[in-house]
Amino acid sequence: MKAAVFIAPGQIEVQETAKPEIDGENQAIIRVVRASVCGSDLWWYRGIAKREANALVGHEAIGVVEQVSADVSQIKAGDFVIVPFTHGCGHCVACLNGFEGNCLNQKPGSNGGYQAEFMKYEPADSGLVKIPGAPADYTDEQLASLQTLSDVMATGFHAAKNAEIKPGDTVAVIGDGAVGLCGVIGAKLLGAEKIILLSHHEDRAALGREFGATDIVAQKGAAAVQQVLALTKENAGVDAVLECVGAAGAIDQAGQIARLGAVIGRVGVPHAEPKSNQLFWKNIGLRGGIASVTKPDKELLLKAVLDGEINPGKVFTRSFDLDHAADAYAAMDQRQAIKSLLVID
């Protein structure tokens, strides 16, 4: 089968590799229909994080189950499924408390190899989410939105839930990448009345407005803080902040624009240790981490996509076939795409 392989920073190749086989319990072999490049993939693509050479890559996909191990009871061959990037066992302390992204039984190295014609996933029963029907029942636009549920839309929703957004809240979203834009959708789903997107790029700001942002703040630094505060009641700050960047400065900025007692939902992969003293003095809560979107959340998002309530697939501004996976990475690295979609069927 064909699969995208990491060779060295800045170098992705599509190679012929062995098709995965069932070799344990609670496993499924999946024919991949759509995959995508995640912003976190750029860390090792750019050489910021280490990755072993010749590793199979990718952690976002939807596809059709081809085979399952004998013990699997909830999933069967022929099922169309979301293949999430988390691998929760469903029964450890972390999973039972809703943190499947921190599953205590996750196998090292199990998160990868989704950018391929076939992949193996475990635990099949607790992790895979069924999509009604078959891929042929959906338009390309719908398939793109379904693909976001494997990570980016789920991560944006995780930020919104962690920020404890309530109906009528004023919310700020820091970061106009795919996660931040999906955070806008998440905030709207939870009932936010005013959604302020901090964005320096016209195309991303326009998409943010389409997703539900009511205000765009294009300034940076202190000017951005002042503009956000001016959009809030009595200049007191927002009720919730979605931090979708990860830079220490983003957390600092979140603390500056949050009102007393607000909550920051943090999903940006950390770049450095932020200063947290201002959060203490303002009684601001800071929650978040690896998206641990539970099955009920995934099913809520799936229903929203199937009902046409949300269309997060619009974050995919470039599409590529698997043979051009290297171009998909380059497009995101060079900011020529908000997010790259791989069409594999």
Question: Predicted segment positions?
Answer:
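Glycine-rich beta-strand-centered segment in the early N-terminal region that forms part
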Residues: I22-A35, I48-V93, P132-T139
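N-terminal glycine-rich cofactor-binding segment
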Residues: V5-I22, G39-Q67, I82-V83, L96-G112
